[in-house]
Amino acid sequence: MISEDHPKPTTEKRTEIIKQKTTQKKNEVTVDQEQSKQQEDRIKIAIDAGHQKKQMSEKEAIGPGSDKTKPMVSSGTEGVVTKRTEYQVNLEVSLKLKSALIARGYNVYMIRETNDVSLSNKKRALMANESGSDILLRIHCNSADSQSANGALTMSPTLSNPYCRSIAADSQELSECVVSTLCRRTGAVNRGVTQTDEMTGINWSKIPVTIVEMGFMSNPEEDQKLSDNHYQAMIAEGIADGVDRYYERRGEKNEEK
């Protein structure tokens, strides 16, 4: 085989090549930094899929400085027909909600993405506070003694809440937006917003928070819907619609705080 020597680049040429590569690298870093900044500036939503497989019956204070205590967390209710656990359904919808929100340009922080966790309601609120999230969505299913009870509702603190009064008004607005759009998407009965100061996961929150009770697992028809993949997707989109409406009312965009 005949070898052919290629002329080596001159010192000037090597210097020019190095400059070009350095400039290209700097441009790439600048683009990466800008994309990273845009990502950080997006509104961040914390999602807490309510309950878990392992019940934690130890007591914890329902709010900062409170003498009143409640069990840390339960496994939730169970479907009257499906016999499926609430914690399973909550997580399924929460994961769909995560995808729906990301598709709309939000950042998402998940409190849990598996059923095998040991997280009290207080801990979940603290995790959301520390995550840098802007709002907290707590996803739950409802239950009642009567099988005829049906529909969706949201929960927020009262305006006189002794633990998180500073976020009460915003939490109520968020709750109103979410329950309205969820019911519009799904056709579920709108049971409105329930105001309460007894929920640990609300009282320890420092960011606007709502508990979303998606439907009654004690109602035969609603129980089956809550485990239906298509219906779960409608719930997720409905909640995401509510988040959009909440920020539209505040004059804020998805991609920036």
Regions found by a protein language model. Give the residues of each.
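Catalytic-site microenvironment of enzymes
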Residues: 1-257
